[in-house]
Regions:
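Membrane-integrated ABC transporters
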Residues: 1-53, 68-89, 107-111, 115, ...
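Transmembrane helices of ABC transporter permease
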Residues: 34, 38-51, 62, 93-96, ...
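ABC-type nucleotide-binding domain
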Residues: 79, 352-353, 359-607
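An intracellular "coupling" helix at the cytosolic face of ABC transporter transmembrane type-1 domains
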Residues: 29, 33-36, 135-136, 154-161, ...
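Short intracellular "coupling" helices and adjacent cytoplasmic loop segments at the cytosolic face
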Residues: 4, 9-16, 116, 124-148, ...
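Alpha-helical segments in transporter systems
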Residues: 29, 37-62, 93, 108-112, ...
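Cytosolic ends of transmembrane helices, especially the final helix of ABC transmembrane type-1 domains
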Residues: 221, 244, 268, 285, ...
């Protein structure tokens, strides 16, 4: 449809796995096999519960026959109804139903336990896997896709597994059991009942096939409407600024009308299934009643057996319906399991070397030696990068967006490995260190601040959980954060909400800087560290950073070139290559790429 936005998170009404057979094998082999004894207990009690329930109508039919014979006998001058015998039958029936209920409870308890244990294991496996995946994986996947696996897919697998396995067992047992009971009562009446079943399912299949496309449209348009609501809510200020309220309402109404049409048709067709089943059920009921009456008049069958057969006949269709519904549920469950296993089978980050180099005693000399790198093999973005950095130097990396500045820092910390060449720290290839120890050498302040829900103190201590309160306060003072923290309610113990919306963007940046200061790293990385802070705060930060960077190798990535004038070396990057290098004054004298960048920013500042 022209102009239609792509659905956010829309999925078909019934999902199908690409390879359901293989996914089922993995689910059994890697997870369900560990619960084989619980599943066996569940199977035994599920079958037992179903069997006791199935026998009920037959026993109730015996009571009906006894009452009928008693009434007929009374009329003909006999003894009448034997109530003690009827009571015995009813007590037996009550006992069977009580046992069936108990068995059902054990079966439900056991299956729920298995499903929740499976959910627990899967969540743990996914959580562990996330920390093993290379950064390249997260470049290919959105946060929403990963969150959907952790939440929606695992929940769907757990819930559907709990319901589906139980329903499959009970439905199959019920169908077989009822069929056996019907055959023991009357083969002729059973054949009459079975003739109606395929006819009813043929009609229902046509209705389901017709309604399915409308369910698909309903899901799609629901996703469009939800997406519009989300966009309109998050961007309502912009909508009002540009006077787009009417246009937004028109667009919403268009999709909402389509949702109404598809939802109405799908629900209407879906609602036809019960009347159709009811109609054919009544037809079967009439046929069985007429035939049963005839057979009873001939003395071939008892009245109680007719009553039992009618009850079995009405119960027979229900488990068949359940199995048809379960098949769709199983498809969705296996599709969810397939996505989970696909995630768990992703390649892990390359393992650390066994004979790793210790970081003890390293001072921070860094060398980039003919480094080539691309996020994909066919698109190299860093070409033959060479640079030598002495310990304690302040190195600024500048260049236009997409020049490869941030990528160089990611390579330095081994978020990615180079395609060719080497990155050395004090003469050792970064691949020769354990990743954990290598990254502990660095302190990083990112452009996008990240704080978790918790106290300000805990956020500052994130990189050094055993830090004392005095150390936390000293770090906050060095980052010029102590003053504003003390003005907040509860000071260092104030809780930051989930989105850190109760403090300003500049305050967030100050806290992340304090967090880095507390870890006392050997190598410092500032990625746009002051880009979102006001001028006064930036001056305070710059002063604190200058003190922090003394004696430490420091890499600064910034678009605002005024913040890196005092750098020992400025590397100017463009399209993955270093095209200029030198101090601020030397690069201005060259009147090259850097000078043009600096002058353009200076002119913008003047304007």
């Amino acid at each position: 449809m022209p102009g239609m936005k792509s659905p956010k998170g829309a999925r078909a009404a019934i999902e199908k796995p690409a390879n359901g057979k293989e996914t089922t094998k993995k689910l059994i082999k890697h997870y369900l096999i560990d619960y084989k004894w619980q599943l066996l207990i569940m199977l035994i009690f599920a079958v037992g519960s179903t069997v006791f329930t199935i026998v009920g109508p037959k026993i109730l039919g015996n009571a009906t026959t006894e009452i009928f014979n008693g009434i007929v006998g009374k009329i003909s001058g006999g003894t009448g109804i034997d109530f003690s015998k009827v009571l015995g039958i009813l007590l037996t029936l009550l006992g069977l139903y009580a046992i069936s209920t108990f068995f059902g409870y054990i079966q439900g308890f056991t299956m729920t336990s298995v499903a929740q244990k499976l959910t627990y294991r899967l969540r743990n496996d996914v959580a562990v896997k996330i920390n093993k995946l290379p950064m390249s994986f997260f470049d290919k996947k959105t946060h929403g896709e990963i969150l959907s696996i952790v939440t929606n897919d695992i929940d769907m697998l757990s819930q559907n597994l709990n319901q589906s396995i139980t329903q499959i067992i009970t439905s199959v047992c019920t169908i077989i059991g009822i069929l056996i009971m019907m055959l023991t009562i009357s083969v002729t009446m059973t054949l009459v009942s079975l003739i109606i079943v395929p006819l009813s399912f043929f009609i229902i299949r046509i209705v389901v096939k017709k309604s399915q496309k409308y369910f698909k449209k309903q899901q799609d348009y629901l996703a469009y409407v939800n997406g519009l609501v989300e966009e309109d809510y998050s961007g309502h200020d912009v909508i009002r600024v540009f006077n787009r309220e009417n246009k937004t309402i028109e667009e919403f109404n268009r999709f909402n009308k389509e949702l109404y049409k598809s939802a109405w048709k799908s629900q209407f067709l879906s609602g036809l299934m019960f009347p159709i089943m009811n109609f054919f059920g009544n037809v079967g009921y009439v046929g069985v009643a007429i035939l049963g009456g005839y057979l009873a008049s001939q003395g071939i069958i008892t009245v109680g057996n007719i009553q039992s057969f009618i009850q079995y006949n009405k119960q027979f269709v229900q488990p068949i319906n359940q199995i048809s519904q379960i098949s769709a549920t199983l498809q969705s469950m296996l599709a969810a399991a397939e996505r989970i296993f696909g995630f768990l089978e992703e390649d892990d980050e390359a393992r650390d070397v066994e004979n790793f180099v210790s970081t003890d005693g390293l001072v921070g000399n860094v060398e980039f030696n003919h480094v080539h790198f691309g996020y994909t093999d066919d698109k190299i973005i860093i070409n033959d990068f060479n640079a030598k950095v002495k310990d304690g130097q302040k190195i600024a990396i500048v260049g236009p967006t997409g020049a490869g500045k941030t990528t160089m820092v990611k390579l330095l910390m081994r978020f990615y490995d180079v395609n060719s060449g080497a990155i050395m720290i004090d003469g050792h290839n970064v691949k020769d260190f354990k990743r954990g120890e290598l990254r502990r050498m660095f302190g990083m302040v990112l452009q996008d601040t990240w704080l978790f829900g918790g106290s300000i103190k805990d956020n500052i201590k994130y990189g050094k959980p055993d830090a004392t309160d005095e150390e936390v306060i000293e770090a906050a003072k060095a980052a010029h954060a102590d003053h504003f923290i003390r003005t907040l309610p509860n000071g260092y113990d104030m809780l930051i909400d989930e989105e850190a919306g109760n403090i300003s963007q500049g305050q967030k940046q100050l806290l992340t800087i304090a967090r880095v200061i507390l870890t006392n790293p050997r190598i410092l990385i500032l990625d746009e560290a002051t880009s979102s802070i006001d001028t006064r705060t930036e001056q305070q930060i710059q002063s604190a950073m200058d003190n922090l960077m003394k004696g430490r190798t420091s890499f600064i990535i910034a678009h605002r070139l005024s913040t890196i004038k005092n750098a020992d070396l400025i590397l100017v990057m463009n399209q993955g290559d270093i095209i200029e290098q030198g101090t601020h004054e030397e690069l201005l004298e060259k009147d090259g790429f850097y000078a043009n960048l600096y002058n353009s920013q200076f002119q913008e500042g003047e304007e």
